[in-house]
Amino acid sequence: MSQANAATKASSDVFFNASLEDIDPEIFGAIRNELGRQRHEIELIASENIVSRAVLEAQGSILTNKYAEGYPGKRYYGGCQYVDVVEELAIERAKKLFSAEFANVQPNSGSQMNQAVFLALLQPGDTFMGLDLNSGGHLTHGSPVNMSGKWFNVVSYGVRKDDHLLDMDEVARLARENKPKLILAGGTAYSRIWDWKRFREIADEVGAYLMVDMAHIAGLVAGGQHPSPVPHAHVCTTTTHKSLRGPRGGMILTNDADIAKKINSAVFPGLQGGPLMHVIAGKAVAFAEALKLEFKLYAKNVVDNARALAEELKSHGLDIVSGGTDNHLMLVDLRPKNATGKRAEAALGRANITCNKNGIPFDPEKPFVTSGVRLGTPAGTTRGFGVAEFKEIGSLIAEVLDGLKVANSDEGNAAVEQAVKEKVIALTGRFPMYGYQG
């Protein structure tokens, strides 16, 4: 073997066999530190969850090497016979999980799945209705700073001021007045049951499509803990992470063959090129997990835990927007503790409790300050926390917020936060992740 060939072989051996730690210790270190953070902190961000080792393996597989523009059996590249199997499994499992006739599993994100529906069913300048961001909607539901708010005429609906519940009579009135081409239901910070049947009746009355973004509650729908929108909506979108407990990505479901064709064309070639086959593999694995009986128990536990957490927080003098929760999340009004979302998020973070500041309906504070925090139970429930643990977590949150109220500063109460942090580390130590003890 020549010297040049030997050098090439040595380089190839390193390329295919050296570890991440050997090749890039900086990235390895950041990942290791993130794993430590996840192990030792309580994750209460409602849109986050923890995937199984099987999902991690699928997403970290050699499928990341394969380009596969198009759809199974109709690719623009050769060598797709095995990724076709992967995508077909993901599609069939998604259809079974949600009792849908058609599924597109290629959207790379929640934003892109919603963009694909707009591209399929609307023209720039068309009118659509969506839940106002300040009432628990999403940026892609018509926020002025988002493409959805820039390209279309958006009519936003919201919640009532007295009870923070959706006012369906107001939704109907706005629909009759504005004649939208599409009505979008679903949100990111609404803790009550959605009346899909009523939304469809309103949509039919004005000749609009009904689109449901069930990204936050898809796992609860799959687990039988929230009514399914699929029988009522013309088209449903959902992310595949959050309560569904899969990899980060999107999916579109429909029972209408004509809409399905438009959706497929909108996703590819309209919006995306090659799909992320390693992510689609992770989606397929997560769907298989969600089809198991254990997932129904998981979904029930998510809701039970959320209700327990909400009641515990209320017992410590905190207000829960709308008075409680029917799903996996809650908005906590911090004004009884004279705290802002910004201060509370930082103080809880120092105590190893992760959440996000969030505006509440009719919030007097600025979006980067807010009067509330959003809390969710999917990740903690995945970890094994039950009602007892979430009651303890509620007490720990109140402890930090009471300390923050006394301190009345951005720095918080270091002694209280350190004491709570030690309790959090002890709690998380009883529920190890990925086989790790300690």
Curated annotation (Swiss-Prot):
Catalytic activity: (6R)-5,10-methylene-5,6,7,8-tetrahydrofolate + glycine + H2O = (6S)-5,6,7,8-tetrahydrofolate + L-serine
Keywords for this protein: Amino-acid biosynthesis, Cytoplasm, One-carbon metabolism, Pyridoxal phosphate, Transferase
Top-level lineage group: Bacteria
Pathway: One-carbon metabolism; tetrahydrofolate interconversion; Amino-acid biosynthesis; glycine biosynthesis; glycine from L-serine: step 1/1
Top enzyme category: transferase
Plays an important role in substrate specificity (site feature) positions: 241
InterPro entries to which the protein is assigned, alphabetical: PyrdxlP-dep_Trfase, PyrdxlP-dep_Trfase_major, PyrdxlP-dep_Trfase_small, Ser_HO-MeTrfase, Ser_HO-MeTrfase-like, Ser_HO-MeTrfase_PLP_BS, SHMT-like_dom
Classification via PROSITE patterns: SHMT (PS00096)
Chief location of this protein within or outside the cell: cytoplasm
Residue(s) carrying N6-(pyridoxal phosphate)lysine: 242
Entry GO terms, CC: cytosol
Cofactors demanded by this protein: pyridoxal 5'-phosphate
GO terms assigned for molecular function: glycine hydroxymethyltransferase activity; pyridoxal phosphate binding
Entries under Pfam families matching the protein: SHMT
CDD domains: SHMT
Subcellular localization, as worded in the UniProt entry: Cytoplasm
Residue sites binding (6S)-5,6,7,8-tetrahydrofolate per the record: 133, 137-139
Protein family according to the UniProt entry: Belongs to the SHMT family.
Free-text function comment from the UniProt entry: Catalyzes the reversible interconversion of serine and glycine with tetrahydrofolate (THF) serving as the one-carbon carrier. This reaction serves as the major source of one-carbon groups required for the biosynthesis of purines, thymidylate, methionine, and other important biomolecules. Also exhibits THF-independent aldolase activity toward beta-hydroxyamino acids, producing glycine and aldehydes, via a retro-aldol mechanism.
Subunit-level organization: Homodimer.
Protein name listed in UniProt: Serine hydroxymethyltransferase
Organism of this sequence: Brucella canis (strain ATCC 23365 / NCTC 10854 / RM-666)
